[in-house]
Amino acid sequence: MNTIDKIFNYNRQPNISPFFKEKLVELISFGTYHNDIEKIRDGIVQELVNYREKYKITNVVIGMSGGLDSALTASLYKTAGYHVIGVTLPIHQNPDETARGVEAINALGLDHKHIDLSNQYDFVVADTISNFGDTSIGNDDRATAMRRGNIRARLRMITLYNLAGKYKGFVASTDNFSELAAGFWTLHGDVGDVAPIQSLTKSWEVPAMAELQGVPSSTIQAVPTDGLGIANGDEDQFGFSYLEFDIALFTLIKNLSLANATESDLKIIDSVKSRVRNSGYKRSNPYNLLHPMFPARFGELEILDEQL
């Protein structure tokens, strides 16, 4: 199976438009879709080993959603010699998602904790209505669904950080590069302390590395969801696939020609532009203002960090 066929297979997508296929071929030739996944994996694992040795922290807590990203993240920490605690945290969740999380935990040989947060979530939503009079929190529109999704993400992160404190460890981030660019995460929610796969593309490097790491095929082939109840899946929110998102993103990053793009192709390109532009504030959070008199203070503190 050649690289393009592998990419289509990982993305459950038999084909893409001629323009997007043309750009994919260009990106493969540039090395953006690099074949040496093992070398990339080894580099990430070494960085995780370096972090463990520098800070003397061996325990890591990971929310196991049943998705590919959390399973790959857990496997990389395991390979790097960490004690990994995988936590399933359903909130009115599809049982299949939780079952996949448990399957990945067992396949990777992780410790498992299970905490159903559905009652806590219901209490927060009900309390928001009763104490603040915010009846709109129950609306069915997309914006309100995102607010409720953010409550889910932040409840999970409170729980994960509490466990990390118990085990004197830290919380892993599980977001990938595509999610980073799209703004597909909750500030102070489904993020953590160390992000091993945040530089990896969802359409290629994440599934290819997961296969290399022995992540169950049922997880690799599962439709990507955020577990926040916002839509039927990540790609449902996009209106197109992660593969098309990644190709469009790198077409913009590398300033490739749009000469052969159809109107439908350009709609995807414009949608990606909009998502990246509108989520920039999240990638710069917290936005630290420089001291008006002593603008070098942050840099001086970074130097001290390195010295110590």
Can you name each region flagged by the protein language model?
Residues 70, 74, 95-102:
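Short, surface-exposed alpha-helical segments at coil->helix boundaries
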Residues 67:
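Conserved G/P- and acidic residue-centered "switch" motifs that form tight phosphate/ATP-binding loops
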Residues 72, 98, 124, 181-184:
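Short glycine-/acidic-enriched loop or helix-start segments at secondary-structure transitions
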Residues 2-62, 79, 85, 92-93, ...:
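ATP/NTP-dependent adenylation/nucleotidyl-transfer catalytic domains that generate, transfer
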